[in-house]
Amino acid sequence: MPEVAHNGEEEVETFAFQAEIAQLMSLIINTFYSNKEIFLRELISNASDALDKIRYESLTDPSKLDSGKDLKIDIIPNRLERTLTMIDTGIGMTKADLINNLGTIAKSGTKAFMEALQAGADISMIGQFGVGFYSAYLVAEKVVVITKHNDDEQYAWESSAGGSFTVKVDTGEPIGRGTKVILHLKEDQTEYLEEKRVKETVKKHSQFIGYPITLYLEKEREKEISDDEAEEEKEEKKEEEGENDKPKIEDVGSDEEEEGKDKKKKTKKIKEKYIDQEELNKTKPIWTRNPDDITQEEYGEFYKSLTNDWEDHLAVKHFSVEGQLEFRALLFIPRRAPFDLFENKKKKNNIKLYVRRVFIMDSCDELIPEYLNFVRGVVDSEDLPLNISREMLQQSKILKVIRKNIVKKCLELFCELAEDKENYKKFYEGFSKNLKLGIHEDSTNRKKLSELLRYHTSQTGDEMASLTEYVSRMKENQKSIYYITGESKDQVANSAFVERVRKRGFEVVYMTEPIDEYCVQQLKEFDGKTLVSVTKEGLELPEDEEEKKTMEENKTKFESLCKLMKEILDKKVEKVTVSNRLVSSPCCIVTSTYGWTANMERIMKAQALRDNSTMGYMMAKKHLEINPEHPIVETLRQKADTDKNDKAVKDLVVLLFETALLSSGFSLDDPQTHSNRIYRMIKLGLGIDDDDAPIEEASPSVPDDIPPLEGEEDASRMEEVD
């Protein structure tokens, strides 16, 4: 609850800052930052947003501008009072807005920004996290915000950043509509009252803001007047200001043609004060200019003013479309991904929509598909109506054509970027997930997007290769692109699944991001070559006649063992077969063509809102493949042929299956039982009799039906474990 104090007749409410905001302000105030000038950029950006909002509302209700038709930003330095004031005629804030937006409700980015700051990030990132207002405390010891919204009274917010702020009804000079921010500057920050400093800061950060930014300065100039006028003026000054504040009068002599003769009336020069006003951002919208006339520096400055980014963009596309439909667009790719790129609740405001240079909105979902939500820029249409509503936008055919063109130009830009290996590497690190999401969602552009993918492979080492490069290296008899999905490059490179494929000299693509699983569900082929997972059934490697003959012989030789293993494992596997993919591993678990891979199963198990009925169906399709050339499998076959009811055979089959599950990337349903089997085998290997073990109460997690292994009589025999 706020504290309420009565100052005369004024009611002043005091509120505590929300904890994270108080922490952020403390960080801003008590840490030294060299580039404090960004506070001006942030306040101008907030003013511009407020002006955008009132202009958008006025398109459907022109009376909203009755409280002030001019949409502008004024900057007023005052040396005497050591204040820097910024006034906008934007939408203003109600009392509730003032309390919520400036102190009691933390934005989602507050904590993320503090973490970034503590990790060494630049203070100039503040605008990207939605907390730019608080940068005012980089230069101010006290901030006063006076604001008037059409639906409320004029209020004043004030804080010296001591953990609290006050709000009261403002009885001072009415501002009509909008917001006035008064910064009471720290003693060592008076440079921001200087004309040159303000001008260069606005030019650097805010010259492309779409509203006039006017600087008001009190200046002096010399004025020539007659002695009589000087006397009159002196008297007036005395009355108005008192004797102490009279203007300094400078006598510059008299104008005489001949001394002592024909005297003319004497004149004086006095210094008078006046208010000089200068518009600081006269540059016309950059997207309306010819791209050939715009320098990279200008693009960079515009990008920074548009996005509040502290770094230059990575790439830019400036184009216009003419004909039946007319629009201009300027698109940028950031140098790095924002912290909340895939946050569902995030307001999408990366592309600003203008109609004939008038800003309409900055959250138009229909303008660009979700997978391109990192692209920043502006689109200026000549054909959309000025008063278009969101509902009309959803149905607009014009917008659908604009969207199609934007996607096409974005893909062109990505392809151009791909020609520069170093820059594309930076781009891919930040936005590869977006490209893969595009392959999953955008069937029209799937082929183009697939050309932009880059993966580590069994032949590229630390470098990444495109699928086009993979195809160019394919062997003559190779018909498919082989890939494996998993958690990391090292894990998949050492997987049993790639043993035979690599030994035969075929390249394997390593897919190590969870989104790759969704991507390959849609990307069935590339350049006429089918994508084949080496972890699924039906892997067919090119074979000569000798290899085919050997495979058939092994199938016959191990047929009875496969049948026995299927009986022992029952519903745990769909079938047991002889493998053509293993070299040094005794066995592996593969999934059916349409089932989930081990990696996909892991991803789905991690989903909080998973569908258990689907999981039960998809997870059941496991196939056990055995390596006919491995001594463990060969010895097991011999034991099974001798006595298929041998308990040791059954135990070893279960142990082999569970170990294969783990090595193939699956998880165990009952890891404790598996662990107990391993412990008993370790005891057997160490020659420890179960009778020698310390007698303790049985753990409830250890099933009673796992008897000790009979190690002394026959080291190879074990009790059956169900």
From Swiss-Prot:
The modification Phosphoserine is found at residues 226, 254. Residues 221-268, 690-722 are annotated as: Disordered. In the resting state, through the dimerization of its C-terminal domain, HSP90 forms a homodimer which is defined as the open conformation. Upon ATP-binding, the N-terminal domain undergoes significant conformational changes and comes in contact to form an active closed conformation. After HSP90 finishes its chaperoning tasks of assisting the proper folding, stabilization and activation of client proteins under the active state, ATP molecule is hydrolyzed to ADP which then dissociates from HSP90 and directs the protein back to the resting state. The keyword rRNA processing does not apply. ATP binds at residues 46, 88, 107, 133, 390. Belongs to the heat shock protein 90 family. Monomer. Homodimer. This is Heat shock cognate protein HSP 90-beta.
